[in-house]
Regions:
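An N-terminal, well-structured beta->alpha segment
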Residues: 1-35, 43-44
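A glycine- and small-aliphatic-rich helix-loop capping segment at beta-alpha/alpha-beta transitions
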Residues: 47-54, 68-70, 115-127, 159-162, ...
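Glycine-rich oxoanion-binding loops at beta->alpha junctions
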Residues: 59-96, 145-146
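Gly/Ser/Thr-rich active-site loops/lids in small-molecule metabolic enzymes
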Residues: 119-136, 188-203, 297-315, 350-354, ...
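A glycine/threonine-rich phosphate-anchoring loop and its flanking beta-alpha core
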Residues: 133, 137-199, 203-204
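Accessory alpha-helical/coil subdomains and C-terminal extensions
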Residues: 161, 187-267
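Internal helix-turn-beta structural module
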Residues: 308-315, 350-422
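Intrinsic disorder/low-complexity segments
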Residues: 315-350
């Protein structure tokens, strides 16, 4: 079963390659000067042929463009000095042109940046971004704040040119295209008041809040003239392709239509509950990005920690079932002693098999792309819970499952979850 799940996962990544999907979205009337931003920037650029000039802005360690391009390399998930250097190159490239085709993918929020001067400086952005990433906030709230501190997010980049077309390869919630890379080329509906409220919730950002309250500090861009945008692909594309491939290899796909975006413990229980209702030959296919709070300096990621939490929940469920099934008192006279109770064989619970994988090939700081495991495997609860407290889920995952490593895939459509029962 796990081999089938691996096949679905790897074939799905190949089928959703950005260079394949972007070609289908290109029309002849689009600008021939190109800016590609994010984890998929190199692959998106390579999907285009008829280009006059191109700037590719990509996080360090991700796929570069093969075709002729200018290159700028920034940081991820942390904003680095390279991110600001990439921001300056981007600003200069855009300011020298009237019309630009923007290819936007996730990861752009950190890998390219410029502070909104004079209100914010580079240190403000680095420190605030680090606090946001560690906060457990959803990506929409994180990017709301990022937009209001940046000179190139929240529509401000597209506002620098006369005409723009934006194609989005989305790693965010369905329909939230302005959150991809913090929406550098799309009009923004959030306000400074929204950003302030978010910062007040996480605390420790009084100086940033004070600067945002300055009446001279501008709002993000609410309207962009002569600008249009379209979606290339998102998590639903990934899930739909996985379902198609599952059917091709003889399995019955059971698709979860809504993305999994809850707290990671809740996400583990939801997936486990859904998987427990599967029949043999069916495969549950879901996608999304649960929220995860970074608690320490260990190694792990969303998919790895989700696997550990599912294993813990399954172990608890099986333990409860054994206790409830193990003894039955016979319905006879009340004089019988507990020693007269009879043991009833425990019913055999189905084994749940899972593959939980990233689409970009990088799960947090774990160095792996995905994990495949059978949830009936034993897990040391005390050790697992201790390691989770310091975000060191990888150490536990390697004991209960098979970690899968692939080169950075060039994709970035959130995560893919595949589960089956035997």
């Amino acid at each position: 079963v796990l081999e089938h799940l691996k096949t679905i996962y790897l074939r799905t990544l190949d089928a959703c390659a950005p260079e394949l999907l972007v070609r289908a979205a290109i029309t002849r009337d689009m600008p021939r000067d190109v800016v590609a931003i994010g984890k998929c920037a190199g692959a998106l650029r390579d999907g285009l042929d008829d280009v006059d000039d191109a700037l590719v802005v990509v996080p360090e360690g991700y796929r570069m463009a093969v075709k002729r391009s200018r290159i700028a390399i920034g940081g991820h998930p942390d904003i680095t000095a390279g991110s600001f250097e990439a921001g300056r190159k981007l600003r200069d490239f855009v300011d020298a042109r009237d019309e630009i085709l923007f290819l936007i993918s996730g990861g752009g929020s950190a890998c390219v940046e410029l502070p909104l001067a004079p209100w914010f400086d580079e240190r403000d952005l680095i420190e605030t971004n680090a606090r946001l990433v560690a906060s457990g906030l959803n990506i929409g709230d994180i990017n709301c704040v990022r937009k209001h501190l940046s000179a190139i997010k929240g529509g401000r980049l597209a506002a620098r040119v006369k005409r723009s077309v934006t194609l989005v390869y989305s790693d965010v919630s369905t329909g939230a295209l302005a959150d991809v890379a913090s929406g550098p080329t799309l009009a923004d509906i959030t306000t400074k008041a929204d950003a302030i409220a978010i910062l007040e919730r996480i605390g420790g950002c009084d100086q940033i809040i004070a600067k945002l309250r300055d009446d001279e500090c501008p709002e993000t861009i609410k309207r962009i003239d002569d600008s249009r945008f379209a979606l290339i692909a998102d998590n639903h594309t990934l899930v739909a392709k996985a379902a198609e491939i599952a059917a091709e290899i003889g399995l019955m796909p059971v698709v979860v239509e809504q993305q999994i975006e809850s707290e990671i413990g809740d996400a583990a229980r939801e997936l486990l509950d859904r998987a427990g209702r599967l029949r043999e030959g069916e495969v549950l296919i879901a996608g999304g990005e649960p929220t995860l709070v970074r608690r320490g300096d260990g190694k792990g990621g969303r998919c790895i920690e989700l696997a550990v939490r599912m294993a813990l929940a399954e172990g608890e469920r099986r333990s409860d079932k054994r206790r409830s099934d193990s003894l039955v008192r016979l319905p006879v006279d009340s004089q019988r002693k507990p020693s007269d109770w009879r043991v009833r064989p425990t019913s055999i619970a189905p084994k749940i098999h899972a593959l939980l994988g990233t689409s970009d090939g990088v799960d947090g700081n774990s160095g792996v792309a995905a994990i495949a495991l059978t949830l009936a495997a034993s897990i040391d609860r005390e050790v697992a819970e201790r390691e989770l407290l310091r975000s060191n889920s990888l150490a536990v995952a390697e004991e209960i499952g098979e970690t899968i490593m692939i080169p950075p895939a060039g994709n970035n459509l959130r995560d893919l979850y595949l589960l089956a029962c035997t």
